[in-house]
Swiss-Prot record:
Residues annotated as glycosylated: N113, N249
Name of the protein described by the UniProt record: Subtilisin-like serine protease Pen ch 13
Subcellular location: Secreted
Top-level taxonomy: Eukaryota, Fungi, Dikarya, Ascomycota, Pezizomycotina
Any one GO BP annotation for this protein: proteolysis
Active site (UniProt): D157 (charge relay system), H188 (charge relay system), S343 (charge relay system)
Organism: Penicillium rubens
Superkingdom, taxonomy of origin: Eukaryota
InterPro entries: PCSK9_ProteinaseK-like, Peptidase_S8/S53_dom, Peptidase_S8/S53_dom_sf, Peptidase_S8_Ser-AS, Peptidase_S8_subtilisin-like, Peptidase_S8_subtilisin-rel, S8pro/Inhibitor_I9, S8pro/Inhibitor_I9_sf
IgE-binding: region residues: 124-134, 163-170, 227-245, 310-318
Key words of the record: Allergen, Glycoprotein, Hydrolase, IgE-binding protein, Protease, Secreted, Serine protease, Signal, Zymogen
């Protein structure tokens, strides 16, 4: 399915050791050897942060001869005051790092992979018509002509084929934290961006789209790469003067990660709406990140008969459902493809957020609540404890 996840056999919560600061992955979680995400205490100043990073580099330099190969502090981030960095350390050094009183916690970096896509050849796409009608079976997508104009959508994914005709020149390349290839060699990112803002396949047909590549052509990456992309997008939104008028779609996730959840929460606090796929494991989404992060809009997948998709995650952290089974959208090379997954559901909501921001002037911090307010109670088979709300754009269509 289209959901991008952390490859693991267990989604149990990370155990906490070393006075609550050095987190350890459970057996079965696929960690990057000797690689970590270091998160600083709230309120640490830029000067204190730089002092710590210099100290960490010196500590690492003194101990790396014990094992070799580790590179020390790497990319750093500052997401709305959440400061930290990714690093490659030996065991002795990481314990020293965790003991620093300015460090909040250290978490192992983990691998991110794409799950297999479910493809139905030449299947019709029904998602757009469904979100503009209070009843199932509609064939037309009805929307206001503002169509997300003036709103920026960041696609944090495998990249975007920005030259695809479905974007009509509204897509641009932002950054790449995954590799040195500024293309979408996977297709997932182009599909999700098209669902959010494509001229033919998208919800917000006039919104701008920015590619934030955090996963490679094979759909693989790390939490640290994803967080680096989120950090870049928040800073770019501020530089554009688009705070409160920006949307981020993350059709990815996996095993619970405190660092990922903290980063996601800070994205929202910074003034960027964040739509997140609930996951495709048919389990409680509270076990997944960033689906379980506070203040994000967590989206489950529905079918064209208003059922809860068999694969979708569920539970109290789900804010609403959106179409996620057999969704057709743009694909690299100028064509289109039909895919299924909560990855397909989340960008419907990202597009709806951009649509309502342009139409009603809703700010990013209020967008999820407004979307839930407009949603209709149509999901007949929602698991116990899960909302029955389905995305609706509020247009007066039947």
């Amino acid at each position: 399915m289209g959901f991008l996840k952390l490859l693991s056999t267990s989604l149990a919560t990370l155990a906490v050791v070393n006075a609550g600061k050095l987190l350890t992955a459970n057996d079965g979680d696929e960690v990057v050897p000797s690689s970590y995400i270091v998160v600083m205490n709230d309120g640490v100043s830029t000067a204190q942060f730089e002092t710590h990073r210099n100290w960490a580099a010196n500590v690492h330099a003194r101990t790396r001869s014990l094992k070799g190969g580790e590179s020390g502090p790497g990319k750093h981030f500052d997401i709305n005051g959440m400061k930290g960095y990714s690093a490659s350390f030996d065991d002795r050094t990481v314990k020293d790092i965790a003991s620093d009183p300015t460090v909040k916690y250290v978490e192992p970096d983990m691998v991110v992979n794409a799950t297999a896509n479910v493809v139905q050849r030449n299947a019709p796409s029904w998602g757009l018509s469904r979100i503009s009608s209070k009843k199932s079976g509609a064939t037309d997508y009805v929307y206001d002509s503002t169509a997300g104009e003036g709103i920026v959508i960041y696609g944090v994914d495998t990249g975007i084929d920005i030259g695809h005709a479905d974007f009509g020149g509204r897509a641009e390349w932002g950054t790449n934290t995954a590799d040195n290839d500024d293309t979408d060699g996977n297709g997932h990112g182009t599909h999700t961006a098209s669902t959010a803002a494509g001229s033919k396949f998208g919800v917000a047909k006039k919104a701008s789209v920015v590619a934030v590549k955090v996963l490679g052509a094979d759909g693989s990456g790390t939490n640290s790469q994803v967080i680096a992309g989120m950090d870049w997008a928040v800073k770019d939104s501020k530089s554009r003067g688009a705070t409160g008028k920006s949307v981020m779609n993350m059709s990815l996730g996996g095993a619970y990660s405190r660092a990922m959840n903290d980063a996601a929460a800070n994205v929202v606090r910074s003034g960027v709406f964040l739509s997140v796929a609930a996951g495709n494991e048919a389990q409680d989404a509270s076990n997944s990140s960033p689906a379980s992060a506070p203040n994000v809009c967590t989206i489950a997948a529905s079918t064209n008969s208003d059922g809860s998709a068999s694969f979708t995650n569920f539970g109290s952290v789900v804010d609403l459902y959106a179409p996620g089974k057999d969704i057709t959208a743009a694909y690299p090379g100028g064509g289109s493809k039909t895919l299924s997954g909560t990855s397909m559901a989340a960008p419907h909501v990202a597009g709806a957020a951009a649509y309502l921001m342009a139409l009603e002037g809703v700010t990013s911090d209020k967008a999820c609540a407004r979307i839930v307010e407009l949603a209709i109670s149509s999901i007949s088979s929602a698991p116990s404890g899960t909302t029955s709300k389905l995305l609706y754009n509020g247009i007066n269509a039947q």
